[in-house]
Design a protein with these regions (language model features):
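Surface-exposed turn/loop modules enriched in turn-prone residues
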Residues: 35-47, 87-91, 136-140
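Ordered, small/hydrophobic-rich secondary-structure cores
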Residues: 83, 92, 104-105
Length: 170
């Protein structure tokens, strides 16, 4: 386990990667294919909005989606500002390795090891659908994230409640 901001990460847990406005990173349209975009969206309890931090050694992490099992990666292995984030099956490449850096405000900056740039949002947009990208460090909230553990009991309870309220097929 390693500490990032105020969150102790465990490989056995899933986390939300939350922007300061409460929206989370997710796989666009719950797409399971390599190359599916990573974007910002309102949290709705879906597994494509949940992430596992997999220890990659040397203080590095791979970030794996709960629904697809794929890793956050740099599109086309790009390292320049504005390179979009997408998901890809696990590789040994550093484009899937991330370092977690705590901020003074208790949030976390997530830096790609290969590019030495941070997870950011295109145009500093914080609305639903904003594309995630990498960018050189700036001292703004658009590069700061809350890593919030998903409560598995709450997830199971929510699923059971939804199941009870689903109408029977006719």
């Amino acid at each position: 386990m390693a500490k990032a901001s105020q969150v102790v990460l465990s490989e056995n847990e899933f986390y939300l990667i939350k922007a300061p406005n409460g929206k989370v990173l997710e796989v666009k349209n719950f797409n399971t294919e390599n190359g599916a975009a990573i974007r910002l969206w309102d949290y709705a309890g879906h597994p494509w909005q949940q992430w596992k931090f997999v220890d990659a050694g040397e203080g590095r992490w791979r970030i794996q989606n709960r629904f697809t099992g794929k890793m956050i990666d740099l599109a086309l292995g790009g390292v320049v500002e504005g390179t979009w984030l997408h998901q890809w099956g696990r590789t040994s490449g550093l484009s899937q390795c991330w370092a977690l850096e705590p901020t003074r405000g208790g949030r976390t900056r997530i830096r790609n090891v290969l590019a030495d740039k941070y997870i950011d949002l295109v145009g500093m947009n914080t609305s639903n659908g904003a594309q995630a990208q990498i960018w050189t460090y700036v001292s703004g909230g658009n590069q700061e994230w809350d890593l919030e553990r998903v409560d598995s009991n709450a997830q199971q309870t929510r699923a059971k409640v939804e199941e009870v309220h689903d109408p029977e097929p006719t």
